[in-house]
A protein has these predicted regions:
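Juxtamembrane/interface motifs at transmembrane-helix termini
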Residues: 234-237, 470
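Catalytic nucleophile loop of clan PA
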Residues: 110, 233, 294
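Beta-rich accessory regions
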Residues: 18-24, 260-476
Length: 476
């Protein structure tokens, strides 16, 4: 540990203790703290990093700026869990304390092998003044490796690749390494932006997890956004999926969507050679969802977690900024295939935490439940409506499922959020997972998902679906 690291450790611990004391003294300052969703102890959280299960324990690292609830220099915060429900904060794992990551320990992934956790990330270096997320030169995106044998103490950082090691037709935007092993060889994908402002994913290969060679690039037939970041490659059944968050989609259907999108392509062929990409499928149609990352559990499930936020969004915000923190993760989701479609559902561990409150037909009303799951099943009529906390409405009519707020003022429940929707021929079932300040909605067994933050004054709910079964369970 060098002098800079020691100073950063003290500063972070001081900021965290100050926030803890503040919330102990003020109920209003902890009002919107979540029960199921991971949040920063203080300051800002964004991308999930290094998601894995290591020696039976789940690890979730996160982009962490403890000194500013609106973002700042990035480091890796660290949580662990035995069940992905109850998490324990382990402190800051990685600090920006080396010449090759001095302006931020940016996003990356974990790879588990031989009793060790290999953490790969992008070390950010800013060489000149400017809007670093948008300029084409003037910054470094270095690929860095750290190894831990116990998930608690982290070894010496090793710089693996620099800008000069990437193809020369790229801007300075190469980042977010995700690593896996296949047929005895190690592979890495990274997001990239070309000099022509075209987004793509780079594929590297290695025989030893340290020395990497560029192998291929994956891109759409026509330009699709100017940057593809946070790439992830995995298989669900026989389907090969390339997940990536895309910046720069404009016009057409994207006008009614978020600033940036997160979704996946199905791959026909081989990303190491000849391939064909499907159309781009969104992971989530709601307001707050970006930079997802997946990992495989020891029992073979593919788990998916995202930042429950949206970068560069001027339309809406979060009032928790005023109380010293901002953002959370989505609740962990299992990705699965049903009838040829990729779907998502809350992890099965949640079932043990549910306590039945009501199970009725057609209509339900309740109050005083900030953390709950509601399901509507056996929907036979092409119309239903759910009202949460008086101003968040989920409804289906005329082939369109909508999530919309009746009050879009930035001081209201919505904090500026308006409406998101998807066209669905038929809705058969609905699952709502609500936390103190977030809602996730799973339509048709998770074929479509909507995520949003919300900030209620009262916790009320009403549901009307003629002939359908409505079940409400409190989550303890």
């Amino acid at each position: 540990m060098n002098t800079l690291t020691r100073d950063l450790v003290k500063l972070v611990e001081t900021a965290e203790q100050s926030q803890k004391t503040r919330e102990e003294l003020s109920v209003s300052d902890r009002k919107f703290r979540e029960k199921l969703h991971l949040m920063p102890p203080v300051g800002w959280l964004n991308d999930p990093n290094g998601l894995c299960q290591f020696q039976g324990i789940y690890h979730a690292f996160f982009q962490y700026s403890p000194f500013n609830a609106e973002g700042g220099v990035k480091m890796w915060g660290h949580y662990t869990s035995k069940d992905m429900i109850k998490w324990e904060y382990q402190g800051t794992a990685l600090y920006p304390d080396q010449p090759f990551d001095c302006h931020g320990v940016y996003s990356g992934s974990a790879f588990i092998e031989d009793g060790k956790m290999y953490l790969y990330y992008t070390g950010n270096v800013k060489l000149e003044d400017g809007e670093y997320d948008y300029i084409r030169t003037g910054r470094e995106g270095n690929t860095v490796l750290v190894i831990t044998e116990d998930g608690k103490t982290f070894g010496k950082k090793k710089e693996l690749m620099r800008n000069s090691d990437y193809p020369d037709d790229l801007t300075c935007h190469v980042r977010d390494p995700k690593v896996w092993k296949e047929n005895g060889t190690y592979y890495m994908v990274q997001g990239a932006r070309t000099n022509e402002d075209v987004g793509q994913v780079l594929v590297f290969e290695s025989e030893d997890k340290v020395n990497w060679k560029f192998r291929n690039r994956v891109e759409s037939e026509k330009p699709f956004g100017y940057m593809w970041e946070c790439p992830d490659y995995f298989k669900i059944g026989d389907k090969k999926l390339l997940s990536t968050s895309v910046q720069g989609l404009e016009g057409g259907i994207w006008e009614d969507r978020n600033v940036y999108q997160s979704g996946y392509f199905e791959i026909e062929g081989d990303i190491l050679g000849e391939y064909k990409l499907s159309e781009y499928h969104l992971w989530d149609y709601g307001f707050d969802y970006y930079a997802p990352q997946s990992f495989e559990t020891e029992d073979g499930r593919r788990i998916h977690i995202s930042w429950m936020g949206m970068p560069d969004c001027e339309e809406y915000s979060n009032p928790t900024i005023q109380t010293g923190w901002q953002h959370c993760f989505t609740f962990p989701r299992e990705i699965f295939e049903k009838d040829g479609k990729i779907c998502q559902r809350p992890i099965r561990e949640l079932e043990e935490k549910k306590h039945l409150v009501s199970d009725v037909k057609g209509m339900l009303a309740g109050e005083g439940y900030p953390v709950y799951e509601m399901t509507i099943s056996d929907i036979t009529k092409n119309r239903f409506k759910v009202i949460l906390s008086e101003k968040l409405i989920l409804d289906y009519a005329d082939g369109k499922f909508r999530m919309h707020f009746t009050d879009q003022d930035k001081t209201s429940v919505s904090s500026g959020r308006s409406m998101r929707y998807v066209e669905v021929e038929e809705v058969e079932n609905l699952k709502i997972l609500a936390d103190t300040s977030s809602v996730e909605v799973f339509v048709n067994d998770g074929e479509y998902v909507f995520s949003t933050r919300y900030y209620p004054e009262v916790y009320k709910l009403q549901a009307e679906a003629v002939g359908a079964q409505i079940t409400l369970s409190e989550i303890m």
